[in-house]
């Protein structure tokens, strides 16, 4: 029996989440919206929602095949996916393989510097406070996750890094950095949210051309075209 979409649960920067007639499942609707700088810059790009929906499904299926448990279940339509309902941790896990963006601004390191080993950072999901950086002591003290869950998130994040660096490199792309979000269902930590060019940085391996949301952030144009190029290189069917 088909899952029935019911009322809106939450509307974020580029996705809307709906509850369904099954309390264990949600529907993610990937919109064409794009925002940057905490919502100060907003624009719509034709087909972006469809590309991100299919891109996310592609990556989630690759990760699941490699043994990473995720909330993704299946595509429902051009812009909708069915996912497991998780109790999300209010935390972003960020891995940086190449220095750029806020890391360079904070630490004064050279833009484009290869980072070995990669840098791992936690951020609190709080738009009003601009997603401040936190550490494991904050997480433990304020009860955002327990130590076992924190270790599981870190382990999965680094395993995902190993998997995706190879996947993208084979497509002629550098995985510069990315963010992940996790949640809990029945005591198990699962990868939630999404993995799309909205939440990672991807550069051409030879030219270091930006093929991600930085094209929107920095007014470079060609946002949809860049996302399509990444999908094409990965062999995705759009």
From Swiss-Prot:
Family matches, as InterPro entries: SAICAR_synt/ADE2_N (IPR028923), SAICAR_synt_PurC (IPR033934), SAICAR_synth (IPR001636), SAICAR_synthetase (IPR050089), SAICAR_synthetase_CS (IPR018236)
Name of the top EC class for this enzyme: ligase
Any one GO BP annotation for this protein: 'de novo' IMP biosynthetic process
Entry-linked Pfam families: SAICAR_synt
Claim: ATP-binding is one of the keywords in the record: yes
Pathway linked to the protein: Purine metabolism; IMP biosynthesis via de novo pathway; 5-amino-1-(5-phospho-D-ribosyl)imidazole-4-carboxamide from 5-amino-1-(5-phospho-D-ribosyl)imidazole-4-carboxylate: step 1/2
GO MF term list: ATP binding; phosphoribosylaminoimidazolesuccinocarboxamide synthase activity
Keywords assigned by UniProt, alphabetized: ATP-binding, Ligase, Nucleotide-binding, Purine biosynthesis
EC number(s) recorded for this UniProt protein: 6.3.2.6
GO CC terms in record: cytosol
Catalytic reaction annotation: 5-amino-1-(5-phospho-D-ribosyl)imidazole-4-carboxylate + L-aspartate + ATP = (2S)-2-[5-amino-1-(5-phospho-beta-D-ribosyl)imidazole-4-carboxamido]succinate + ADP + phosphate + 2 H(+)
Domain of life where this protein originates: Bacteria
Protein family: Belongs to the SAICAR synthetase family.
Protein known as: Phosphoribosylaminoimidazole-succinocarboxamide synthase
Protein source organism: Nitrosococcus oceani (strain ATCC 19707 / BCRC 17464 / JCM 30415 / NCIMB 11848 / C-107)
GN (gene name): purC
């Amino acid at each position: 029996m088909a899952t029935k979409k019911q009322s809106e649960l939450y509307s974020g920067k580029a996705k809307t989440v709906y509850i369904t007639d099954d309390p264990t499942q949600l529907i993610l609707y990937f919109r064409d919206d794009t925002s940057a700088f905490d919502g100060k810059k907003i624009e719509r790009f034709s087909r972006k929602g469809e590309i991100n929906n299919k891109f996310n499904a592609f990556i989630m299926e690759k990760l699941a095949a490699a043994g990473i448990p995720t909330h993704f279940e299946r595509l429902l339509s051009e812009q909708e996916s069915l996912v497991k309902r998780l109790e999300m941790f209010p935390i972003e896990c960020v891995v940086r393989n190449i220095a750029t963006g806020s890391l360079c601004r904070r630490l004064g390191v050279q833009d484009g510097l290869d980072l070995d080993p990669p840098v791992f950072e936690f951020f609190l999901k709080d738009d009003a406070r601009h997603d401040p950086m936190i550490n494991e002591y904050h997480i433990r003290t304020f009860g955002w996750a327990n130590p076992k869950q924190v270790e599981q998130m870190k382990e999965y994040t680094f395993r995902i890094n190993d998997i995706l660096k190879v996947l993208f490199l084979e497509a002629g792309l550098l995985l510069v950095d990315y963010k992940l979000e996790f949640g809990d269902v029945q005591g198990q930590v699962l990868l939630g949210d999404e993995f799309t060019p909205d939440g990672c940085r991807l550069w051409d391996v030879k030219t270091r051309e930006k093929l991600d949301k930085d094209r929107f952030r920095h007014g470079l144009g060609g946002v949809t075209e860049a996302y399509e190029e990444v999908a094409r290189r990965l062999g995705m069917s759009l």
